Design a protein with these regions (language model features):
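A structural boundary/capping signal
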Residues: 1-268
Length: 268
């Protein structure tokens, strides 16, 4: 494989927070773990989803029509569903494996639902819920919250996550496509850290920095992980990048400055 995934993700990161071709971006992230596997068939699968939903768009008059069309295609014809048998399987956050197995985490499936919904002319955004990842669909002035992990079912108000209840509706807001991609990668990173695999966590953090190079907290995490595995020069550079991006006086800036000073004393 050429450097296409890295080049693609670098350009994506430099372009800002989106909207992006989010499903393609998720595939490119997965391709970094499968350098010998051709991406073309997976991109063709995304194109088929897009073409099918575009053909349905004229029939989508209300957001509920669109939600049903998504369910019929993704859950019905294609068989996508949440992996309730082995939720923590790392393949559930690897978009290539998700396409192969038709199983995934809420955020991975959500990316496919976002891809399909946008092809049909709807607005689709992930929501910043702390628990289960859900999507908000909007069309012609109406909106609906759906759960990709459970077959794309609509979530009525009684069963909304706490952050989305009517009396707390302002607590959960739509997030950028970059935030959704970071959430996907963070699932893998947390599993790596839980398994004590610092090298894997470091590689995943590099990818997160690639798609969101303006985020100081990611540079801080990259510095800490580099330091933990003994790559001190890279840790120093990452602390400096964090300081360049974090506003002076903020806790993150102060902590990075202290740790950088300590690291420089070790390097001298």
């Amino acid at each position: 494989m050429t450097n296409e995934p890295l080049d693609y993700l670098k350009r994506l990161g430099e372009s800002g927070d989106g909207p992006h071709d989010i499903a393609r971006a998720a595939l490119m992230l997965a391709a970094l773990d499968h350098p010998r596997r051709p991406v073309a068939s997976y991109l063709s699968h995304l194109s088929e989803i897009e073409e099918t939903m575009r053909a349905e768009s004229a029939m989508i008059l209300r957001v509920g029509d669109g939600a049903r069309a998504l369910v019929e295609l993704l859950a019905g014809r294609l068989g996508y569903d949440g992996d309730r048998m082995d939720y923590d399987d790392a393949r559930n956050a690897d978009m290539m494996a998700v396409v192969d197995r038709r199983r995934g985490l809420p955020v991975a499936l959500g990316i496919l639902y976002m891809h399909a919904a946008r092809a049909a002319g709807m607005l689709a955004s992930g929501l910043n819920t702390q628990s289960h990842f859900v999507l908000r669909l909007s069309h012609r002035g109406d909106d609906l919250t759906i759960d990709p992990f459970h077959g794309g079912q609509a979530i009525d108000r009684e069963h909304l996550p706490v952050e989305l209840r009517p009396d707390d509706r302002g607590l959960a807001q739509p997030v950028s496509d970059t935030d959704v991609l970071l959430r996907l990668q963070n699932n893998l990173k947390m599993r790596a850290l839980g398994a004590g695999d610092g090298e894997r966590a470091l590689e995943l953090t590099r990818r997160m920095v690639l798609v969101a190079p303006s985020r100081p907290d990611l540079w801080f995490d990259l510095a800490r992980l580099n330091e933990a595995v003994g790559v001190l020069g890279a840790a120093r550079d990452a602390y400096e990048k964090c300081l360049d991006r974090a506003p002076s006086g903020q806790a993150l800036h102060n902590e990075a400055a202290i740790l950088l000073s300590q690291l420089k004393r070790r390097l001298n």
